[in-house]
């Protein structure tokens, strides 16, 4: 399913400031749903879950491609409109509604700005043993991850390097999804009671909930591509180059800095076709 909420006074992500926000998101929803139906889920139902009456031409496009539309109020996980990523929390609200109102064996939700290009059958098989979530693979030298962990510490009162799960992907069999949702609701209740505010949206809640379950990284099936004009790559601590000698000649040059650190430069001189 693709969850999407629209409320004029509510903040969305920092990535979109367009005045025609509704139109942009509905186009994204159509692409996400249609790609899932055509490429991945021919034997499964694809659903747009939303709190609005979908206008034409988008409603006609979705229904014309056998995509279901479920209307569900934004009546849970709602922190109010003046909250960073306020609308992102609707994903959890939508999941709660479909778990109550439908009876499928497996459930998955994805962000609206995705393109699905392969079958989900192997994902469903994985869900027999695990909840599948996306580890965004931030290390401690990434400022965003350090800030995320600082919020976790402030909320829990202890240091813990939990996995930062991305909000763009979740998949589980129904019984696991129901238990996961219950844990998410407990985190939400604790946040509300303590008037605790996070700047990391739904990812804060799902990452805390994931600690309690047998979660497997879905990184083999999904990858987050940052396509903005500015991107800060992570520093790689270890590079592994299997079978490198079969593909290219490698010259290794070493130099010792004044600090005594050894730096190894791999210069790829010649590529050999195999």
Task: Identify what each model region corresponds to.
Residues 1-79, 100-103, 264-273:
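N-terminal anchoring/stem segment of glycosyltransferases
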Residues 23-26, 30-33, 77-108, 122, ...:
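A conserved donor-nucleotide-binding helix/loop in the catalytic core
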Residues 75-80, 139-141, 223-228:
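A short acidic, often aromatic-flanked loop/helix-cap motif at beta-alpha or helix-coil junctions
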Residues 82-91, 146-150, 234-237:
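Short, surface-exposed amphipathic charged segments that create phosphate/polyanion-binding patches used
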Residues 91-142:
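GT-A fold catalytic core of metal-dependent nucleotide-sugar glycosyltransferases
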Residues 120-187:
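Conserved catalytic core of nucleotide-sugar-dependent glycosyltransferases
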Residues 160-248:
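Catalytic core and acceptor-binding pocket of nucleotide-sugar-dependent glycosyltransferases
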Residues 235-274:
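Long, low-complexity C-terminal extensions of enzymes
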